[in-house]
Regions:
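Extracellular polysaccharide-degrading/modifying enzymes targeting complex plant/algal/animal polysaccharides
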Residues: 38-262
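Low-complexity, acidic Ser/Thr/Pro-rich repeat tracts that form intrinsically disordered stalk/linker regions
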Residues: 25-35
Length: 264
């Protein structure tokens, strides 16, 4: 089965951070006689019909439109999407000569200067669970419990735990209402669930002078059926939490695992 080859590409339950996964080889297309759905992050619209003349803009819209055996063909560009479920046997591939990138990082549009050489996003950024650790006591994990990521001009910043520590090479997540535990020393006792959004990111460089990307997705793709093929797609910058049992109010338990192949 094609899914077996995908699994061999080491993307089962993979947490995708600074390193990237370049999917450059895949088995034959899901079906030679299926439809081709064209997608262009830069020149498409999800109001389009998926033809070459009117491509869709997102992979998510293409997956909804596709039927079993179809091919989703990606034009060059950056696709800022996540939590995508592949429930049909489709091929997702780069168009000829294209090098598409699927990333979980967004480029915030709203920043405010703090007057102290630091800049903050709005307070509507994604809240990641920082107590969802394999260790039942998250305090023993330290900074490793925090899955958040920020990139400036493509280079990762180092996360710190206070605004005072923010420099040009570090960032801080200001979360006034983080996910907490019912038992502070044992996350297996359950979580106090909080809204999906409500945090702010603080950096020490002027975002008007740089490209700043903040990871806002936990998982890239979930493969939920057989006969799925990928080709020519780079996948990068996803922030999966360590445990899979946190019920996020928007994305449920798929905050664990950067990319997942469900076994049949």
């Amino acid at each position: 089965m094609k899914r077996r080859i995908v699994a061999q590409m080491a993307i089962l339950a993979l947490s995708l951070s600074a390193p990237v996964l370049a999917v450059t080889h895949a088995p034959q297309a899901a079906a030679a006689d299926g439809n081709i759905i064209h997608v262009s992050a830069e020149g498409g619209s999800d109001a389009g019909d998926g033809t070459a003349a009117k491509p869709l803009q997102t992979i998510g819209a293409a997956l909804k439109k596709a039927g079993g055996g179809d091919t989703i063909e990606l034009a060059n560009g950056t696709y800022r999407e996540g939590e995508l479920a592949v429930d049909k046997g489709v091929t997702i591939k780069a168009a000829e000569g294209a090098k598409p990138v699927l990333t979980g990082a967004e480029v915030p549009k709203s920043w405010s200067a703090g007057g102290d050489g630091k800049w903050s996003t709005g307070k509507d950024m994604v809240r990641f669970c920082t107590v969802c650790t394999i260790n039942a006591d998250p305090t023993k994990e330290g900074i490793a419990a925090h899955p958040e990521q920020v990139f400036v001009d493509g280079k990762p910043l180092t996360q710190v735990l206070s605004r005072a520590e923010v420099t040009e090479s570090t960032f801080y997540v200001d979360d006034p209402d983080p996910v907490t535990l019912k038992n502070p020393k044992n996350n297996q006792a359950g979580y106090n669930v909080k809204p999906h959004r409500g945090t702010s990111y603080v950096i020490g460089v002027d975002p008007n002078q740089h490209q700043v990307e903040v990871v806002q997705h936990s998982r890239a793709l979930s493969f939920n059926t057989d006969n799925i093929a990928l080709s020519g797609l780079t996948v990068e910058k996803y922030s999966a939490v360590q445990r899979w049992d946190y019920e996020d109010p928007e994305i449920g338990t798929i905050s664990g695992g950067g990319m997942v192949v469900a076994a049949h």
